[in-house]
Amino acid sequence: MCYNTAMAQLICKDLILGYESKIIIKKLSFAVNAGDYLCIVGENGSGKTTLMKTILGLLKPISGTVETGEGLLPDEIGYLPQQTFVQKDFPASVWEIVLSGCQSRCGCRPFYKKEEKKLAMQNMQKMGIAHLARRCYRELSGGQQQRVLLARALCATQKMLLLDEPVSALDPGAQEEMYTLIEKLHKSGITVIMISHDIDASLRFATHVLHIGKEIFYGTKDEFVHKSTCPDCNGQIRKIFGRKI
């Protein structure tokens, strides 16, 4: 697996990931450059979310390292986790949730500065939810809730976003809206790393693909389409393109 670390924002070296004595990912190495749109795909239970939590420092690898570069600090990564029922019923206002994304900027301060409140409002406007500021989060639709959480993630960074299944449980219309928003953020210069079960969407939007399974593949989207030797990858690509790979 070849990769260039010279201009990388994120470098994962020889990662072995798992829980207790069970290893789920072995010897994974890849690098993400500024401006990349990396989609992480694979079967359920293959370790995609474990990898993302390791990148964020929420889990420790069994071995290997995760490093940042190009001026990216570990606390400058915005994170949109998979939604849970607890999150969906969270009894807070949209404004409170989005503003909480600025907490990493506060340090020991028990209050938000004017600049942080301005940033929160700007990100709400960017996501088209400024008019929902005083609404209770749990009263919103699934698509609106995801926009709120994406605005919150943007308060932490203008450099890199990590998104874990950002369109899961959304209806097709809301999925397309979310993909469009994420693509606009990518075009504005933000590096995107997204877990997705949808290889079709990955091939529409990604610059690079990381497939985790019995075989691991990392490369550009074109390399994934034309050179991947993963049997389960090829089956899904054939469905999309209607031809043998």
What do these predicted regions represent?
Residues 172-174:
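Helix N-cap at the start of a conserved alpha-helix in ABC-type nucleotide-binding domains
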Residues 161-164:
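Catalytic Walker B motif of ABC-type/P-loop ATPase nucleotide-binding domains
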Residues 64-77:
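Conserved ABC transporter NBD signature motif
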Residues 196-197:
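H-loop/switch region of ABC-family ATPase nucleotide-binding domains
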Residues 136-140, 144:
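Conserved ABC ATPase signature
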Residues 209-222:
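H-loop (His-switch) and adjacent beta-strand-loop-beta switch element
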Residues 114-132:
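Conserved ABC ATPase "signature" region
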